[in-house]
Amino acid sequence: MIRVRPNEVTRIIRQQVKKYRQELKIVNVGTVLQVGDGIARIYGLEKVMAGELVEFDEGTIGIALNLEADNVGAVLMGEATNLKEGASVKTTGKIAQIPVGRGFLGRVVDALARPIDGKGDIASFTTRLIESPAPGIVSRRSVHEPLQTGLIAIDAMIPIGRGQRELIIGDRQTGKTAVATDTILNQKGQGVICVYVAIGQKASSVSQIVTTLEKRGAMEYTIIVAENADSSATLQYLAPYTGAALAEYFMYNGKHTLVIYDDLSKQAQAYRQMSLLLRRPPGREAYPGDVFYLHSRLLERAAKLSDELGQGSMTALPIVETQAGDVSAYIPTNVISITDGQVFLSADIFNSGIRPAINVGISVSRVGSAAQIKAMKQVAGKLKLELAQFAELEAFSQFASDLDQATQNQLARGARLRELLKQPQASPLSVADQVATIYTGINGYLDDINLEDVRGFLIELREHINNEKPTFKEIINKTKTFTQEAELLLKFTIIDLKKNFKKRIK
């Protein structure tokens, strides 16, 4: 028979009483009234906040967007195939946030920063709100450093600065993504961290971009956020904010970042779908009334930070697709009014064989020469004017039968200047190469070379300077100025090379 020791029983009970902690947790619970098309209507969530995350009993997470008198409209993050009417929902007390950090470099993630490239989990010890407030006026300083794209047409005539927001706009299949990916490739060795956000793209297109960046060694400083065409509208809507949050981590740590949103038209369409399903009143083109705020709060997060905050920067290159070149549609006009300029890509120019197909007449940078080094300002000043005059003369010359010699010379010069702006995809040029190329065209050294030989001569010139005259590149990179020494060196190099080139052509 077991003997009961009262002292021991008392001691055990006392220990258990000491350990016991009474926790009273109040959970705000509701019931699903209706679910479908990525939207759930919930009854009973009386204390829910706007934008708060809610958790359904089968594990799906949603965001409470519509707070109405008798129900709450929530958008679902994911498929939620097992979610049914009558299921219980509880509030989490949290706003959507994601992990951020250096571990994301070289990875492909979704809108919730979960890896989708099959390379395992990402170690991260910091989180950021997906929707963070933009830096205030005092936190910023004016844009004054160039962000080189490697494309002559942009760096010379529509310069982009670190902290600027420059819209890339054009019809489908005019090379918008190519301009963006070339800009990423050109940041190699520049200390700029790039974030490419693919919204509603084909999975094959995103895969192609990843392959290009990996081949060129650009993935080591790039993060890709991808929500493909088959993703839910909620995740497509969140993807750009996730990209901005990932870039902000680096910006507030004193780094320079570049974010590409490809493209915001698809994000607006996803938001329109969500809003219509939530029964919000439609406005112009059936978009909701706050579609301007959708993009403004995203693009205002791009900034050049003040010295006190570490001088970091976030440059935004949003992409918007137009229909038949119509820039007066709702979304294009909204984004044009938010950004600091636009690069307009034309289908007609693209089809005429000029790539990148930038319409220099309509494109503009509101930062201007503040985002150029002195060397570029010195040579590129006349380029835009000469091209504008050429475009006018070219249109006029189609109607005129006999043109005087001066007009013919100007037309010949303009055709060669347009030729030097052509660049194959994925071959960005350094600043020194661009300065040499523009100087050659502006000063008439290409005038007596046949039009079809211009690109061949320029390629040869750039190779010759890089291999035989490294001093030129050193001067430009060190002083950022097109000095007299650099000009003389370049002039004699062009003259010598031209003689040999002409002999070979003959």
Swiss-Prot record:
Binding site for ATP: 170-177
Source species, domain of life: Eukaryota
Its EC number(s): 7.1.2.2
Keywords: ATP synthesis, ATP-binding, CF(1), Chloroplast, Hydrogen ion transport, Ion transport, Membrane, Nucleotide-binding, Plastid, Thylakoid, Translocase, Transport
Chain ranges passing through the membrane: none
GO MF entries: ADP binding; ATP binding; proton-transporting ATP synthase activity, rotational mechanism
A GO cellular-component term linked to this record: proton-transporting ATP synthase complex
Coiled coil ranges: none
Annotated site (Required for activity): 363
Pfam families for the chain: ATP-synt_ab (PF00006), ATP-synt_ab_C (PF00306), ATP-synt_ab_N (PF02874)
Subcellular location as annotated: Plastid, Chloroplast thylakoid membrane
Catalyzed reaction equations: ATP + H2O + 4 H(+)(in) = ADP + phosphate + 5 H(+)(out)
Membrane topology, as annotated: Peripheral membrane protein
Class of enzymatic activity (EC top level): translocase
Matching InterPro entries: ATP_synth_asu-like_sf, ATP_synth_asu_C, ATP_synth_asu_C_sf, ATP_synth_F1_a_nt-bd_dom, ATP_synth_F1_asu, ATPase_a/bsu_AS, ATPase_F1/V1/A1_a/bsu_N, ATPase_F1/V1/A1_a/bsu_N_sf
Key word Protein biosynthesis present: no
Function, as annotated: Produces ATP from ADP in the presence of a proton gradient across the membrane. The alpha chain is a regulatory subunit.
Quaternary assembly: F-type ATPases have 2 components, CF(1) - the catalytic core - and CF(0) - the membrane proton channel. CF(1) has five subunits: alpha(3), beta(3), gamma(1), delta(1), epsilon(1). CF(0) has four main subunits: a, b, b' and c.
UniProt similarity note: Belongs to the ATPase alpha/beta chains family.
The protein's name in its UniProt record: ATP synthase subunit alpha, chloroplastic
Organism of origin: Euglena gracilis
